[in-house]
């Protein structure tokens, strides 16, 4: 198999949205990270250090992930309401 064929058949990483539980390509989802310092942020580039979780880029999936506490379980941290509102604003942008 040539290098060109390998590049064409290369698999893209798949991740599951915490809100709707739909499996999508990693680059279609938004990564939320708990940094080593304990801060919860939206990782736009997908390269921040820390424990990550993925959701679709819509507010409904974030609401569902928060309501079911899936986001807190995935990040292993309690998330204050102020941070959730900040995440919602970041995702909408």
Segments the model singles out, each with a brief description of its role:
Residues 31, 41, 54-56:
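Short, conserved beta-strand segments within well-ordered enzyme catalytic domains
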Residues 11-14, 50, 55:
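Processing junctions and N-termini across compartments
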Residues 34-36, 46, 60:
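A short beta-strand motif that forms part of the nucleic acid-binding face
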Residues 38-50:
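Short linker/helix segments within small regulatory modules
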Residues 63-93:
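C-terminal structural segments of small proteins and small subunits
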Residues 21, 57-62:
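Cys/His-coordinated zinc-binding microdomains
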Residues 2-38:
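N-terminal first-folded block
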Residues 25-28, 61, 66:
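Short functional micro-motifs and their immediate structural scaffolds
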């Amino acid at each position: 198999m040539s290098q060109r064929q390998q590049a064409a058949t290369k698999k893209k990483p798949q991740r599951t949205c915490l809100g709707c539980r739909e499996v999508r390509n990693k680059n279609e989802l938004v990564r939320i990270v708990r940094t080593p310092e304990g801060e919860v942020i939206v990782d736009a580039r997908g390269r921040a250090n820390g424990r990550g979780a993925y959701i679709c880029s819509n507010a409904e999936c974030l609401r569902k992930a928060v309501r079911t506490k899936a986001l807190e379980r995935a990040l292993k941290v309690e998330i204050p309401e102020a941070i959730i509102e900040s995440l919602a604003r970041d995702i909408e942008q």
